[in-house]
Amino acid sequence: MKNRGGGGIANHPQVQGKRYPNCRQFDVLELCFEEWLLGQVSVHTSHPNSLSFSPGMKPSIEEVGHASLFPNSTTRLFSAARGGFGNPAPARPTAGLVGPIEMAAPLIAIVGPTAAGKSALALAVAASLDGEIVNYDSVQLYRGFDIGSGKLSRQERCGIPHHLLDCLDAEEQFTAGDYRREALSVLAEIRARTRLPVFVGGTGLYLRAVFMGLFDGPPRSEELRRRLRGLAERRGREFLHRLLKRLDAAAAARIQPRDTQKAVRALEVCILARTPISKMQARGRSGLEGYRVVKVGLNPERKELCQRIDKRVEEMFARGLLEETRALRARRDWSRFKALGALGYRQASAVVQGQLGLPEAVLETQVATRRYAKRQMTWFRHEAGIVWFDGFGDDPRVQSQVIDFLRETGITVRCSGAL
């Protein structure tokens, strides 16, 4: 980090009072950040231009963010593009739909466990009711993750428009909040064409984010996240949980001590918003307005579902999952590909690295996928308003039952938006 005008943080008199021998300016910033999180530094603000450090006391978020400690904007602790430490985060766009809402428009969501035939049912519904499909599977968002995610090929999509599919580069980070914003934009476009949106996928959190909304937290800061992950690597994953407990005990109580991802986000919100994340979550969420949501659930027989899962996994490896994984890992930035930790890709990576044999990888993927399907059903059974249909989505009889049900509810071809 360059020192531009005014001497920078390394020459600041309050920092000079600490013992940081042989530290570059960047190192000093890291040390200041870590000491603040540890609660070993206190910043006194009796006068806005006279700050001092003293060990043993925990400063408030507002005090540590005081701009006079970092007089040059280029040398503040965080300078993320959309807000950072010491700078109030800019207001997020209000979640909602583009344009005025006059009458409720229909929206279909197909839910159920993996390998239940949700994609086949979505195609049948979209074809019969003039719909467009919106993906809510977190892995299918990424380009290059095709075989392991069960992504339909262009030919298999039967000419029906698909959205939020192959829309991200492998290294891009994507949150439930990001998904909600993109999905709302897609919904507005589909509505403008007077067509029926049909959501299909397996990431229940994404669907919940669209329908129920998320708390209005600050945008993520990659710089802050990098620093927090660095602390976890140096001091262990439980370390972040202990820090969070100091700032927001209520949030820490809901997060497992070794869940680094959730701890990082909770700390990020506490720091950037200068408010405990638990308080922000308690303020409520803004749900989806202007749509009549119909949720259709597939409830396949458990034994047959497990058989289908086992067969699908075998077919994935036979179709080239190892080669797809090897190609992804051959890229220079492969370590940043979050989706490589997904089911199938994780086991295939172990084979590529020589840590697992192929038969063991297939079996491990089958067992893990069966458990995942069970968790999916548990998740969706806690969701309100789902109409369940016994069977698989690729069964023509089930497809007819679902389409007849949707028509009976008033959803017809070329929905005008009024029901």
Tell what function each PLM region has.
Residues 5-8, 17, 39, 56, ...:
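Residue-identity detector for glycine
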Residues 45-48, 67, 86:
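Short hydrophobic alpha-helical segments enriched in small aliphatic residues
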Residues 10, 21, 45-48:
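Short linear motifs in low-complexity or flexible loops
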Residues 40, 62, 70, 75-76, ...:
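Short linear segments in intrinsically disordered or otherwise low-structure-confidence regions
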Residues 78-79, 97-419:
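Phosphate/pyrophosphate-binding catalytic cores of soluble transferases and nucleic-acid-acting enzymes
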Residues 1, 9, 15, 28, ...:
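Hydrophobic alpha-helical signal/anchor motif
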